[in-house]
């Protein structure tokens, strides 16, 4: 007990004396040593249980119990630490450390959100947009609740914020596919803000990828160019979002009839394309099929329709070779519509109508497909107003576009 009492920093000396009295009585010492210097050395050096010094200390303190005044450190040759006199304790430091690691999150809360972000990205095109919105929106609200209504560590907060941003990117894509302009921009804004706070600039870049695509199909190429440039300014070097935004920049220059810039940027993109897989599904992936599709659209805008046919057919071939073609129905439909536009310009409307029917046969008529098909139908009517196949296609298109875009996609 004496050893414990001596080693407890800041223990009041009257308590220490009481402990010594108990120990001295138990050991029944008959000889009393009065060498206080040896006692002081024992205390200051830490002492060991096997040392005999505690017995001398017991004798001294037992004798001192008869004193009127309580014992002081000087009575034992022991100097109390300065910081202890100021009220500093190890317990206070331990409390600070505990505060830094205190969390109300359950094991798996963050990991579960991370998993669903990957799942939503990979299986995006296999779910009805209405169903998908409900699922992603619930997860986004869950992330918000964990951030605002639960205690968490700074590290956990940063990761939750990053995941919240990625969920908002997915919600922005759904809003884009539904043609919801204000909602798309709002979720892009939120994703950018979350990425900045989480110091996850790839989230910011992905938000600008959505904003760029949405503005392009909405007929605002300069807004799309601004978004691509902004995204590239923060995209981490070597990240696939950087290459995707570079490819976006190439087709935007084509859309703006800037042939030389398109050629330069597309050459830069091609230097990386050999390292890409031919086809890969998901919102956050990039493959050679996407680049071929981007090039087909670009060549149509530049008026190079024969080259556009080749690029569109390459993209279509890549998508059809996918183990699960239904995982990229929108990109496949866009490539088929680009092929139809090229055939229209080359004077073969029957092939144009055939390619367009294949594009609309996938059953997932998102806003970008609707806009592209309406443009195609306008070009066909402008050039071949008397052709029966063109009139029939116009009626079919109106029927297709009247269907509920929230309906589940048709099985492949």
Regions found by a protein language model. Name each.
Residues 22-49:
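Recognition helix of helix-turn-helix/homeodomain-like DNA-binding domains
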Residues 62-78, 291:
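Short C-terminal boundary/hinge segments that cap the last helix of small helical domains
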Residues 72-94:
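Domain-level recognition of soluble alpha/beta enzyme cores
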Residues 101-105, 110, 114-412:
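Conserved binding/catalytic microenvironments
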């Amino acid at each position: 007990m004496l050893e414990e009492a001596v080693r407890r920093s800041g223990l009041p000396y009257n308590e220490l004396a009481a402990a010594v009295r108990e120990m001295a009585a138990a050991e029944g010492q008959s000889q009393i040593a009065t060498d206080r210097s040896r006692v002081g050395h024992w205390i200051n050096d830490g002492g060991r249980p096997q040392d005999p010094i505690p017995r001398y200390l017991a004798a001294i303190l037992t004798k001192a119990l008869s004193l009127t005044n309580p014992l002081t450190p000087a009575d034992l040759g022991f100097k109390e630490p300065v910081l202890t006199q100021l009220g500093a304790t190890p317990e206070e430091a331990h409390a600070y450390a505990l505060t830094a690691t205190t969390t109300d999150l359950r094991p798996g809360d963050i990991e579960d959100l991370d998993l669903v972000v990957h799942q939503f990205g990979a299986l995006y095109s296999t779910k009805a947009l209405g169903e998908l919105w409900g699922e992603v929106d619930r997860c986004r609200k869950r992330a918000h609740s964990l951030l605002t209504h639960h205690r968490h560590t700074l590290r956990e907060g940063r990761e939750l914020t990053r995941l919240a941003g990625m969920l908002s990117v997915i919600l922005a894509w759904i809003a884009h596919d539904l043609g919801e302009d204000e909602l798309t921009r709002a979720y892009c804004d939120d994703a950018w803000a979350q990425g900045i706070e989480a110091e996850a600039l790839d989230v910011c870049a992905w938000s600008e990828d959505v904003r760029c695509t949405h503005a392009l199909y909405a007929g605002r190429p300069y807004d799309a160019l601004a978004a691509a440039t902004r995204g590239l300014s923060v995209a981490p070097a070597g990240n696939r979002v950087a290459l995707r935004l570079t490819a976006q920049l190439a087709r935007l220059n084509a859309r703006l009839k800037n042939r030389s810039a398109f050629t330069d940027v597309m050459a830069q993109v091609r230097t990386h394309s050999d390292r890409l897989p031919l086809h890969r599904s998901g919102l956050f992936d990039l493959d050679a099929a996407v680049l071929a599709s981007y090039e087909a659209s670009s060549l149509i805008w530049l008026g190079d329709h024969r080259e556009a046919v080749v690029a569109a057919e390459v993209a279509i071939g890549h998508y059809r070779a996918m183990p699960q073609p239904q995982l990229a129905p929108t990109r496949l439909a866009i490539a088929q519509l680009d092929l139809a536009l090229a055939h229209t310009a080359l004077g073969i409307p029957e092939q144009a109508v055939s390619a367009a029917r294949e594009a609309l046969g996938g059953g997932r008529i998102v806003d970008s497909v609707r806009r592209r098909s309406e443009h195609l139908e306008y070009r066909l009517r402008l050039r071949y107003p008397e052709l029966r196949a063109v009139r029939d296609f116009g009626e079919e298109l109106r029927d297709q576009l009247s269907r509920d875009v929230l309906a589940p996609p048709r099985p492949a």
